[in-house]
């Protein structure tokens, strides 16, 4: 296990030497790749699929920036002591972080202007396009449309909340929290705890999808 206190102590004592030494450790490169990959999966699987928050143009650009950092972390993790692989990882990390911040700031500005009661706040604000342009002309919207094709408007984040299936939320939360606590103290009984929590969660997700499809059908009629 990584000694976090020891790493922090070394960083405070000799910051330059410590940073150079960290770059030669595979763990930190994998940590960057896993962290960014986890955020991409969270944005897609939870916000886009579960909450039906369609990604806008800036959103897919932010995903691309995170994907670049995942790629750089995996490349550098092959051999962190190789100067070429480490340089690729550093360039990807800096490029992804800078571009991610850039698009995040732009999206935040659009969100502020859209939700500002002052109509003059929209002056000069550029909207989002449904035809994204990725660096190097990569047709990511065609290769992976589920992940990189913008289908929403910038600044309009309206998740579909639970309706009649909302009564299952306390059962899901309480059941799974209780199961996690039981997993630490008594793994054998945790199986029965999850037996109550997981089906409730699956049923709530099913009801959410059913309600959403029914609303779409009513709008179409």
Swiss-Prot record:
It is a multi-pass membrane protein. Pfam families: DsbB. GO terms for biological process: protein folding. It is found in: Cell inner membrane. GO terms for molecular function: protein-disulfide reductase activity. HAMAP family: DsbI. This is Protein-disulfide oxidoreductase DsbI. It comes from Lelliottia amnigena (Enterobacter amnigenus).
């Amino acid at each position: 296990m990584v000694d976090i206190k020891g790493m922090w102590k070394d960083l405070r004592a000799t910051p330059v030497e410590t940073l150079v030494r960290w770059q030669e450790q595979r763990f930190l490169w994998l940590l960057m790749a896993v962290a960014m990959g986890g955020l991409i999966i969270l944005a897609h699987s939870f916000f886009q699929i579960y909450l039906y928050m369609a990604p806008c143009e800036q959103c897919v650009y932010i995903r691309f920036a995170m994907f670049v950092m995942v790629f750089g972390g995996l490349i550098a993790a092959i051999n962190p002591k190789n100067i070429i692989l480490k340089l690729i990882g550093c360039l990807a990390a800096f490029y992804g972080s800078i571009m991610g911040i850039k698009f995040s700031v732009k999206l935040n500005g659009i969100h502020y202007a859209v939700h500002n009661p002052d109509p003059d706040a929209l002056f000069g604000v550029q909207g989002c396009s449904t035809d994204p342009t990725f660096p190097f002309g990569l047709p990511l919207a065609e290769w992976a449309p589920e992940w990189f094709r913008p289908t929403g408007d910038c600044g309009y984040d309206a998740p579909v909340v639970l309706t009649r299936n909302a009564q299952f939320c306390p059962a899901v939360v309480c059941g799974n929290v209780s199961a996690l606590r039981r997993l630490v103290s008594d793994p054998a009984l945790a199986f029965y705890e999850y037996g109550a929590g997981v089906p409730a969660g699956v049923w709530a997700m099913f009801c959410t999808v059913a309600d959403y499809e029914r609303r779409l059908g009513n709008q179409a009629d």
